[in-house]
Amino acid sequence: MDIAFHPQINEFNGNVSVQLIIDDIHSDSIVDEEIPSQNQYKIFDNRKKVWNLQNINNEIKKASSNIKVFIESKYIYDTVKKYPELASRVCSRYEITKCDVLMFFDYPADKKTLDIILEKAQPKKVHFMSYEPKVMDEAEFLKTFTGMVKFAAHNMGGKIDLVRCAGFLGKSIEVFQRLLDLYEEVGFLTVTDRNNAFYIIDFKGIDDLSKVLHSTKYAEIFDMIVECEAFQRSLLEDDLAEVLL
């Protein structure tokens, strides 16, 4: 997809409006600069662009390139699902396949996951779109995760999808593996099966989350959560060529 985005201010009869302009990146009037990189792919920085999803959807429809859109967070997917060309190209870390262009509407929570995605996709071009990291306080985070555990116990036969947890809450899979191990340790559940993709649990009940909050192991997990948020912030704010080395 050889396009870039920039806003243009228009004034007519005293009325001012802002229009999103889509540029061909091979055009002489290019505004969106390619970031110099030592990687095998070209990096395009759209992190601070104000973009219109309908326009992007239309451009993707016209493109001849094989385009993939990385999104795992439900709240981000909900913003693009009504645009068929975008939605049909959405993939998670496990669904990603080789492509020409990879667009990050969602940001991985750790370098390991980012590297896995890029290795699978082997893209020629990578676009980083604007993104708002999902940040929660400890109480909100644990309450949300606990709700997901209860839902899995009552509706999914005890199967907890680690990627879904990671995508929904914007954290690494390792965070949720450690959390589930801690929940088992304090007696909230028993893990009957586990692998890198999912856990199967026998839910016992959650009587007091302070058992988790006051655990020294949770302090270590919280440090991991902070590291995830710092990595996503780095992808959003820092020199992409350096972050992606």
Predicted feature locations:
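Acidic, two-metal ion nucleic-acid-processing modules in DNA metabolism proteins
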Residues: 1-91, 99, 103-106, 135-245
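Long, low-complexity, charged/polar intrinsically disordered regions in eukaryotic proteins
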Residues: 100-138
